């Protein structure tokens, strides 16, 4: 009998019962909540007269709608100028108090983007099933977790029962061996993977990321990669547990202590695919060949190395891709064969659940130090992923580096990743963004998003256009 994959092990450890149609009832260990996908779920509980099944499994924080300007944040919820945003944040606060759920509120130093806060607090632990009403919940798979996003009705179901009905995915291994070159980051790795397999390449699969590149990668880097598993078409992305994983978790607020810690570590050390495990699909890349990446179009798969030009229609593989590229040229205001350096940038955004952790901010600061934002850039902003990330960056003096260069230093939140708060692009503006999606209108109506790493975004802010950070 063949060995088990990491996904198989996590799945089997959480099956409550298997149903006649092949689906399973899975137990959920951790449920993270935010203000956008939870109101209807809480309302459903109230109408049915139910209470959460296991209070301690649930933790909430507002992130999508919170303003990132200090002026608004200093006034708390009452200072949120947008009515819809204020109501959503207030409703989360009210619901958490009514149901006695732990919330890191808008004025709590622990507040931040839910996928930054969970690991930071030790709420995310190896071997857990982790869900949240947010598609980028795969982030937590970096800890050897089975983590995925859920819809609002499922949020209610988890609150009420601590279980979910799920169908098992197939197994895919994405192996990246070799050593990354100078200036090549985890963001470049995951963009290169998506560029290779496409945004539908992982559909129906749980992706395990393996190989030397991921063994060498930091935990924060692994979070960046797992975060974008959904952009590769997979609902789940994960990396096996190793000593780095355990060291990262150790001593965090919600991590086990004492004898429970020793028991947990013994289990966590089993969370890797067996040597004889069989995957349904295997994709391989050579890490040494990956360059800094830049997305040029309106899908994360429309991505190229910084050394390349916008592709021409002759390079398209079929009529569908030709049609997609033609529409992307028009929306993005680009020409086939255009050099990336010729794209005039308007704004730069460094933040989001993909790239707003302390390592990301350090990487950007290293590029920015002693330089100035180009006069042609209308706005360059740094948005830390949590209050604690912001605090650590300020302790290291990174905020001063950015402020002296002409960047804005903001309060934590999802910010310009999505057009659900005050931080938006204007129609026609090009933005170098460290976020995860570049769909039409994602950062604002008519906004044009280019996905890059923090280092590449920082270099673009200084140059006013895309440059190869390796020679910057």
Curated annotation (Swiss-Prot):
InterPro entries: 3-IsopropMal_deHydase_lsu, Acnase/IPM_dHydase_lsu_aba_1/3, Acoase/IPM_deHydtase_lsu_aba, Aconitase_4Fe-4S_BS, Aconitase_4Fe-4S_dom, IPM_dehydratase_rel_enz, IPMI_cat. Its cofactor is [4Fe-4S] cluster. It holds the Pfam family Aconitase. [4Fe-4S] cluster binds at residues 353, 414, 417. Binds 1 [4Fe-4S] cluster per subunit. The keyword Membrane does not apply. One of its GO terms (molecular function) is metal ion binding. GO terms for biological process: L-leucine biosynthetic process. Heterodimer of LeuC and LeuD. Belongs to the aconitase/IPM isomerase family. LeuC type 1 subfamily. Catalyzes the isomerization between 2-isopropylmalate and 3-isopropylmalate, via the formation of 2-isopropylmaleate. This is 3-isopropylmalate dehydratase large subunit. The lineage of its organism: Bacteria, Pseudomonadati, Pseudomonadota, Gammaproteobacteria, Moraxellales. The gene is leuC.
């Amino acid at each position: 009998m063949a060995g088990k994959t990491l996904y198989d092990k996590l799945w089997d450890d959480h099956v409550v019962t298997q149903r006649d149609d092949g689906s399973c009832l899975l137990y959920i260990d951790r449920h993270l909540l935010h203000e956008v996908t939870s109101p209807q779920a809480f309302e459903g509980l109230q109408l049915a007269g139910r209470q959460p099944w296991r209070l301690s499994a649930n933790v909430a924080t507002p992130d999508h709608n919170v303003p990132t300007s200090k002026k608004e944040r200093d006034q708390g919820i009452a200072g949120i100028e947008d009515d819809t945003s204020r109501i959503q944040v207030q409703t989360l606060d009210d619901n958490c108090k009514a149901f006695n759920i732990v919330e890191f509120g808008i004025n709590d130093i622990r507040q931040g983007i839910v996928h930054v806060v969970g690991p930071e607090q030790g709420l995310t632990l190896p071997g857990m099933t982790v869900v949240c009403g947010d598609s980028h919940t795969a982030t937590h798979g970096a800890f050897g977790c089975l983590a995925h996003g859920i819809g609002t009705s499922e949020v209610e179901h988890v609150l009420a029962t601590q279980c979910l009905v799920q169908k098992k995915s197939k197994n895919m291994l994405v192996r990246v061996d070799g050593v990354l070159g100078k200036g090549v980051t985890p963001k470049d790795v995951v963009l290169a993977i998506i560029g290779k397999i496409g945004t539908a390449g992982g559909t129906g699969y749980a992706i395990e990321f393996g190989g030397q590149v991921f063994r060498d990668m930091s935990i924060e880097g692994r979070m960046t990669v797992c975060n974008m598993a959904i952009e590769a078409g997979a609902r789940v992305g994960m990396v096996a547990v190793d000593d780095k994983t355990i060291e990262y978790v150790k001593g965090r607020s919600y991590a086990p202590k004492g004898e429970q810690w020793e028991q947990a570590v013994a289990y966590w050390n089993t969370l890797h695919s067996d040597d004889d495990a069989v995957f349904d699909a295997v994709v391989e890349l050579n890490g040494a060949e990956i360059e800094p990446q830049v997305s040029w179009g309106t899908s994360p798969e429309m991505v190229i190395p910084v050394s390349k030009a916008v592709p021409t229609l002759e390079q398209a593989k079929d009529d569908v891709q030709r049609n997609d590229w033609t529409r992307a040229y028009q929306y993005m205001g680009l020409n086939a064969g255009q050099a990336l350096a010729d794209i005039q940038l308007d704004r730069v955004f460094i933040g989001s659940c993909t790239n707003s952790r302390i390592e990301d901010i350090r990487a950007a600061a290293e590029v920015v130090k002693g330089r100035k934002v180009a006069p042609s850039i209308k706005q360059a902003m740094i948005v830390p992923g949590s209050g604690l990330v912001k605090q650590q960056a300020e302790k290291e003096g990174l905020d001063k580096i950015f402020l002296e260069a002409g960047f804005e230093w903001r309060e934590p939140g999802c910010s310009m990743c999505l057009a659900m708060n005050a931080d938006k692009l204007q129609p026609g503006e090009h933005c170098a963004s460290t976020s995860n999606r570049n769909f039409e209108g994602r950062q604002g109506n008519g906004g044009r998003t280019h996905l890059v790493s923090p280092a590449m975004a920082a270099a673009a802010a200084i140059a006013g256009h895309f440059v190869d950070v390796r020679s910057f």
